[in-house]
């Protein structure tokens, strides 16, 4: 853990209340504790719970062995050449004469994961299409349902307000929508961009879901069937972009109108980025090994899974430093969550929470060794990022980062007390605390800092404008997590989750409670969509994307189980995203 102490030293030198003697003592204490990690379980006499988490499938040696030929100059040169060809393709496309073709191209570029190369070009294209076809109802007259649906989705995604009434011409007297199968698929995808009180889109989602499920049973075109079945599992708006890219590159050759040059560029870009992600993961793995936290037998060793969360948040090549920071934050949250949920006694947890709130390094002698280690890891990582931000961007962010950990631990201790008292909270009482205890808010706050080009007091205060957006993103992750993990967590002795709280309060069956939570997630997405439309332009686009991508990751990780907690479920994605090139 010597490297972790090195992280803290520069910041401590900036703090006049802590002497150099204390810094040296902190360094020595941390190094000593590192040697004691492996003995924590053997010296323990307190009777503690165990979650019996499965061990990690990914050894340090395996991660360090990852390599890729796509770091070579010849691949980079070919990528630059293909990028130029695709850019010309966008610029020469005539969106006025054939808007559907151009919208399909934009959609393909996004799903193939290469749209980040052409942000200005895509922005200009969508602006022209909006002005010529979507700005006012009189421009909709000659547009079919397919064009309206695809344009609606892409334009709403990029911040344009397109009213739901654009679809009313395609509703018959019975309330059914009229269109072919591709139109229905695009309308289905468009409906997930709804906000509150948009009944036309609610009806569209219900109708198209039923229509597509019925069509899937009898459809002869297996290529279209492939796209329908994929959409019914994960609508595009709820899909993790990098996971979607991995899937879409494989099926894009089957799509009508596919472009071989676009496909070649997408494959090459995916493999080049995979090489970048391998190096990021190797660096994170070295840090994880230095902390020795993987030797904590009571906690989940999930470094690779935590790294996946950061790739979901932002996979772009320039965000390497950010992924490094966020992987550390994710990993520490996972371990500290297990401390509060399973391993720690209530007196220990109350003391730990008090020390986090005071942020007093001199008070940690009162803690058991395993909690000293947890506190020092957060303390040092916070100091490191504070120091780097102060030296690189000229602003002291330590209070901002410290508060993120304090808010998290204060939510954890509430749940620990609920468990200790055998208390089942009401549904509303649960979610008012659980949106924080899911651990997403600290990630978002760190991500905000990492995406700011200029860090100022005004910028840090401005995030308060996004509090509702952040809360709803956290809440979706919380509820998707509950849908996928609550049964396992109850078996190991955790507190009741949202499903059980709703059942206890309302008398509902588990099936009824799950249906309620599922609809609650849909309604929360509507709020998130609206907040993104209203205030998204006030923040860096990469930050807004991160906020939206985290609930997408919640759906991905916890649909049909717990990919974060059960390594076997996540294994195929490690190989497809980080090991095997396309």
UniProtKB/Swiss-Prot annotation:
Pathway involvement of the protein, from the record: Secondary metabolite biosynthesis; terpenoid biosynthesis
Cofactors named for this entry: Mg(2+); Mn(2+)
Chain positions recorded as Mg(2+) 1 binding sites: 337, 341
Cofactor comment: Binds 3 Mg(2+) or Mn(2+) ions per subunit.
Transit peptide, start-end: 1-87
Sequence motif DDXXD motif, residues: 337-341
Induction: Circadian-regulation. Expression peaked after 9 hours in light. Down-regulated by wounding and elicitor treatment.
Superkingdom as given in the UniProt entry: Eukaryota
Entry annotated with the keyword Plastid: yes
UniProt keyword list: Chloroplast, Lyase, Magnesium, Metal-binding, Plastid, Transit peptide
UniProt tissue specificity: Expressed in young leaves. Detected in mature leaves, inflorescences and stems, but not in roots.
Reactions accelerated catalytically: (2E)-geranyl diphosphate = (1S,5S)-beta-pinene + diphosphate
Binding locations of (2E)-geranyl diphosphate: 300, 337, 341, 478, 481
Positions bound to Mg(2+) 2: 337, 341
GO BP term, pick one: diterpenoid biosynthetic process
Membrane-spanning ranges: none
Molecular function GO terms recorded: magnesium ion binding; pinene synthase activity
Localization terms from the record: Plastid, Chloroplast
InterPro entries associated with the record: Isoprenoid_synthase_dom_sf, Terpene_cyclase-like_1_C, Terpene_cyclase_plant_C1, Terpene_synth_N, Terpene_synth_N_sf, Terpene_synthase-like, Terpene_synthase_metal-bd, Terpenoid_cyclase/PrenylTrfase
Function: Monoterpene synthase converting geranyl diphosphate to (-)-beta-pinene and (-)-alpha-pinene in a 94:6 ratio.
Swiss-Prot/TrEMBL domain comment: The Asp-Asp-Xaa-Xaa-Asp/Glu (DDXXD/E) motif is important for the catalytic activity, presumably through binding to Mg(2+).
Protein name, entry field: (-)-beta-pinene synthase, chloroplastic
Species the sequence originates in: Artemisia annua
